[in-house]
Amino acid sequence: MFGVLNSSDHRAAVQQRNIPAFGRTSFELWTDSPTSNHRCETGGNGRDSGQNRVRRPMNAFMVWSRDHRRRVALENPQMQNSEISKQLGYQWKMLTEAEKWPFFEEAQRLQATHREKYPDYKYRPRRKALPQKSDKLLPAASSSTLCRQVLVDEKWYPFTYRDSCSRAAHPRMEDHLSSSQPVNIANSLLQQEHHYCSTSLRDSPETLAMHLSADPPF
């Protein structure tokens, strides 16, 4: 009897320990781990070095626009940040060299302090992501209306044809595009395409066999 009570008490104690864990959110459970506390303190994933998170020292324009940007944003809460930057850039250009000089001195002082604090600092700008090239062909310009009708892309032909006909006709079309006059390209190539397709379809293996069987022997 004593052993049964101990086992039931043990199960109740285990359930009491597990109930609060299920009632808490995943964010609370995540922040209890030591690795998560380290991430919260460092502000990242813990793998980045301090040099990667060091900001560049401000230049003269940044020193000057630090207070002016705040004032313009308060006066114009609906203005976007890009518009504020344009306005501040225009105002900065309108200042004289004498008016800019105190901000240049402050920027030099900040750069010297930054150099002493981070002697191994090197500015590493982020590379812009290159736009992915699309495999789809763009439509031709309006000035090449004639050539647009005879492009190699099969979807652009105004008539139907077989693959064997198109594969044999494409090299011929490319040769004519490089050597013939641009005025009569569309008409001549379309006529050649129709003629070649009609002859190739007419001279199929079955048709050739019929012709050979019908020819008289020598």
UniProtKB/Swiss-Prot annotation:
State the Gene Ontology BP annotations.
cell differentiation; male sex determination; sex differentiation
- Listed CDD domains: HMG-box_SoxA_SRY (cd22034)
Would you say which domain of life the source belongs to? Eukaryota
Query: Which residues are connected by disulfide bridges in this protein?
Result: none
| Cross-referenced InterPro entries | HMG_box_dom, HMG_box_dom_sf, SRY, SRY-related_HMG-box_TF-like
Q: Where in the cell is it found?
A: Nucleus speckle; Cytoplasm; Nucleus
Q: Which UniProt keywords apply?
A: Activator, Calmodulin-binding, Cytoplasm, Differentiation, DNA-binding, Nucleus, Sexual differentiation, Transcription, Transcription regulation
Q: What are the boundaries of the region Disordered?
A: 33-53
Please provide, alphabetically and separated by semicolons, the GO molecular function terms listed in this UniProt record: calmodulin binding; DNA-binding transcription activator activity, RNA polymerase II-specific; RNA polymerase II cis-regulatory region sequence-specific DNA binding
Portion annotated as DNA-binding: 54-122
UniProt record similarity statement: Belongs to the SRY family.
Function noted in UniProt: Transcriptional regulator that controls a genetic switch in male development. It is necessary and sufficient for initiating male sex determination by directing the development of supporting cell precursors (pre-Sertoli cells) as Sertoli rather than granulosa cells. Involved in different aspects of gene regulation including promoter activation or repression. Binds to the DNA consensus sequence 5'-[AT]AACAA[AT]-3'. SRY HMG box recognizes DNA by partial intercalation in the minor groove and promotes DNA bending. Also involved in pre-mRNA splicing.
Q: What is this protein called?
A: Sex-determining region Y protein
